[in-house]
Amino acid sequence: LDAGITFARSHDAHLDVLCLGIDRVQTGYYYVGAAPIAPIMVQETLDQAGKDAHAVEAAVRARLAAEDIRWAVDTAIAQLGAFGGEVGRLARFADLVLVPQPYGKNAAPEQEAILEAALFDGRAPALVLPADQPNATYGKRVVIAWNQSDEAMAAIRAALPLLKTASLVDVAVIAPPSHGPERSDPG
């Protein structure tokens, strides 16, 4: 949240925050005898996800109320594996999605799916914040993943304002073809 506030302030941007309550219980694995209580269990776990989302929403609203930026908060509840549509629906209206690094010792299991939903369902560019320095000055060193796709070109176009201010831009060429008129050349 702090990184989003800093980014919004430095770019005179509007910050939208999604507070997502995730039901992590996978209902497909109940045993046969659980059929009478399964609907109650599903409702209980969804209710808990809703309480979690609303608690986060209250904390986010309290934090943002003291800030001098434009902001909005959205809250959603979804089951594990089914929240991609909700994330994508909101991400498609964003110019940029800020997400924590999806891998590492403190990463939540759903962070990878949230990033993928923003990128592929929402078709939004994403800025992955480093896990060890989430509030550091970001955008000085940028890594671009290039695979010659339309998506890669759209991401680079969307990132041009950040790329122009970067001190160093690295291009990671992903699975380049061995031959062809448009062969990627990292040199």
Model-derived features: where do they sit?
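Generic structural signal for residues in well-ordered beta-strands
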Residues: 15, 71-75, 126
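Small/aliphatic-rich secondary-structure junction motif
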Residues: 1-42, 121-122, 134, 138-187
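A short acidic, glycine-rich active-site loop
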Residues: 38-55
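Structural beta-alpha unit
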Residues: 22-24, 47, 59-97
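Short, flexible loop segments at the rims of nucleotide/cofactor-binding pockets, characterized by
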Residues: 73-78, 104-107, 148
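Short, small-residue-enriched loops and turns at beta-alpha junctions
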Residues: 78-81, 105-106, 177-183
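Amphipathic coiled-coil/heptad-repeat helices and related helical stalk/stem segments
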Residues: 83, 111, 152-155
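Gly/Ser-rich helix-loop-strand patches that form or flank binding pockets
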Residues: 6, 85-135
